[in-house]
């Protein structure tokens, strides 16, 4: 999430221009949306709907499921107000999202692996779902669960590059080795 935010903002100081970034949450915990103060119970279609019917149905498009910069900014400011009751001033002006869209996930996504198990081409569902977004974004970052299930396999099949953030501990290193072997 930090990487997505940094890329979307760029840096005038270092001559790095901002990028249009899509941050895809493939983790059923849905922490990406939570990070931006989004109440997952109030958003429309999520990754689960896109997986379960979106690829097979022309009625649901990727843009129907994404949360844009204005929505994310509003959610962050509302979250700030909720966390700071009674403050006379409003949220800081620097709470603003630019050039960043989020494709949220929720707990319903955890059941999709069972559904995917019987489908032909199950490993390419995310790649197909994201194909329409390729020209709209400079960078697409996919946040995966810490497992080697079909959600992670879909992310790996859709990705051109893989970045593996880990904690400096034995079990994380062991898991990274398993992931590298799977790739």
Protein language model annotation of sequence segments:
Residues 1-183:
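P-loop NTP-binding core
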């Amino acid at each position: 999430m930090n990487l997505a935010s940094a890329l979307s903002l760029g840096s005038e100081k270092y001559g790095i221009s901002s990028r249009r970034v899509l941050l895809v949450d493939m983790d059923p915990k849905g922490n990406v949306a939570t990070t931006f103060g989004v109440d997952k119970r109030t958003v429309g279609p999520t990754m689960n709907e896109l997986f379960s019917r979106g690829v097979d149905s022309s009625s649901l498009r990727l843009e129907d499921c994404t949360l844009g910069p204005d929505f994310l900014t509003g959610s962050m400011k509302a979250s700030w107000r909720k966390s700071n009751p009674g403050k006379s001033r409003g949220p800081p002006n620097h709470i603003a999202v630019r050039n960043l869209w989020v494709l949220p996930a929720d707990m319903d996504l955890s059941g999709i692996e069972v559904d995917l198990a019987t489908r032909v081409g199950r490993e390419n569902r995310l790649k197909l779902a994201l194909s329409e977004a390729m020209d709209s974004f400079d960078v697409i970052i996919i946040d995966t669960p810490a497992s080697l299930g079909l959600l992670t396999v879909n992310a790996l099949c859709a990705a051109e590059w893989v970045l593996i953030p880990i904690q400096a501990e034995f079990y994380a290193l062991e898991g990274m080795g398993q992931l590298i072997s799977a790739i």
